[in-house]
């Protein structure tokens, strides 16, 4: 299935949509896309395990059965390794999280960090690390961590979905019940993007992709993939009746990949 939506706000000149080869309904959620757009990562709705899926052929390979592996896995810049979480429970049934590294070429899985109550991926020396801790927006740069939370540090303001721009200069985040924002590494120059930009992802340094979803508290009723630019352009990329969600982006190949409510994977191909 394939069709084309022509741009109205001119974020993209055109966008084509098609179901990924071999994609079937099931317990499946999109978890990531490689920097070169050659493969995606999928997990279950409970973030158990990771699968590598060739984006062109649909060929699938199981990488790990780790609990929690599907929650924000990190793909290396060369696409050859993945850092993923491993959730375990101690003798008191307390939840602990470790980090494993998956070598895709060797097919190996090794422990990177032992399980702990709180765990962070890096020290921010090569690139700032942004993350959520106690529902607050945090950043680590050169081993120093600080609470940014530009919209307020209080129990009423909760932050989710943080990510660093490709050039490493801006932070994208979402304030629950309010909307998506962008700020600099100091938590300043705060810019509101949109209320209906949930699960936001950077497409490039000036463009953000998110979802505008509606639910009844139990199931999704509608969801469209949206594009936003920092200078205020907005474009609906998919019809809301298709209920496409949780986009992942690869601007190098002009790709936006998303998953349907039934677990099928869809690919959007963009032209600037």
Which role fits each region the language model picked out?
Residues 1-4:
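Bacterial N-terminal signal peptides
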């Amino acid at each position: 299935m394939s069709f084309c939506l022509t741009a109205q706000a001119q974020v993209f000149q055109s966008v084509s949509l098609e179901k990924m080869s071999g994609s079937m309904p099931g317990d499946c959620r999109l978890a990531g896309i490689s920097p070169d757009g050659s493969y995606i990562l999928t997990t279950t709705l409970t973030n158990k395990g990771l699968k590598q899926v060739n984006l062109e052929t649909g060929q699938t390979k199981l990488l790990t059965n780790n609990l929690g592996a599907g929650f924000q896995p990190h793909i290396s810049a060369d696409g050859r390794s993945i850092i993923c979480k491993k959730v375990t429970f101690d003798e008191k049934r307390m939840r602990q999280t470790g980090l494993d590294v998956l070598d895709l070429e060797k097919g190996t899985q090794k422990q990177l960090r032992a399980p702990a109550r709180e765990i962070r991926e890096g020290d921010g020396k090569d690139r700032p690390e942004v993350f959520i801790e106690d529902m607050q927006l945090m950043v680590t740069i050169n081993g120093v961590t600080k609470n940014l939370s530009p919209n307020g540090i209080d129990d009423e303001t909760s932050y989710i979905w943080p990510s660093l721009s490709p050039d490493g200069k801006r932070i994208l985040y979402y304030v629950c019940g309010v909307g998506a924002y962008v700020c600099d590494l100091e938590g300043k120059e705060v810019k509101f993007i949109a209320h209906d930009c949930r699960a936001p992802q950077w497409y490039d340094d000036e463009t953000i992709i998110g979802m505008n979803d509606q639910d009844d508290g139990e199931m999704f009723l509608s969801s469209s993939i949206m594009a936003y630019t920092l200078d205020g352009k907005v474009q609906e990329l998919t019809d809301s009746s298709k209920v496409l969600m949780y986009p992942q982006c690869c601007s190098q190949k002009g790709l936006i990949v998303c998953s349907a409510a039934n677990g099928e994977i869809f690919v959007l191909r963009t032209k600037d």
